[in-house]
């Protein structure tokens, strides 16, 4: 596997994201000049660079693993997989739906629209800049998403996107074909991972998350992983919780590569 560290939250570079990456894993840290005049052009520049890196990694016969500060980077990753000739399905593990739109969002937070953008909403903003083809809704599995806003629930009720609880995730529930796994660590209960940007109560524990992640790994169909470390920058990890999570997930990945 090839680890690409993308310490960005949307178009904001976060050198103090403080992700405890293992010292025995080669890591390429990502830093891009984003001189664009607006957020859309800056996101397009960033995700085009991510897409190019993912494409190179796949063509070299290596699994791309992105460690980032948000879920929107998965848009660039999907474009990169497509450029490399893959047609990925999406498994999106998150406490939230990430299915808001500019018209429905109460906060204006673009990270809360990440999956909706990936699925083809307003392609003029980001997708068209990447030549991204939206995945079919029927090949998208949204896992957990316990904190949904009403417009997101309405969208899901009429869409082809499948849903699963974290504990209910099995090989049979996975969509077909190669899989891009977007794993937002805010799916955990906030008591398990302090300092999250958008904590959502009543979430699963670490053991349940690792079990669900292994369901995807054990399928043998993982094409790429975005490990979204969605905590506030500048925070330390005094109890070693982040280190345990990141180290364990990457160790599981390496074990599957042997």
Language model: regions and residue ranges:
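Catalytic cores of soluble, metal-dependent hydrolases
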Residues: 2-65, 76-77, 83, 151-258
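Active-site glycine-rich loop that binds ribose-phosphate moieties when present
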Residues: 109-135, 143-150, 159-168
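Cofactor-binding loop segments of dinucleotide-utilizing enzymes, especially the Rossmann-like FAD-
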Residues: 6-8, 93-95, 120, 145, ...
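Active-site histidine-anchored catalytic micro-motif
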Residues: 63-131, 220
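Catalytic metal-binding/acid-base residues of hydrolase active sites
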Residues: 72, 96-98, 146, 186-188, ...
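Short active-site oxyanion
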Residues: 62-64, 137-141
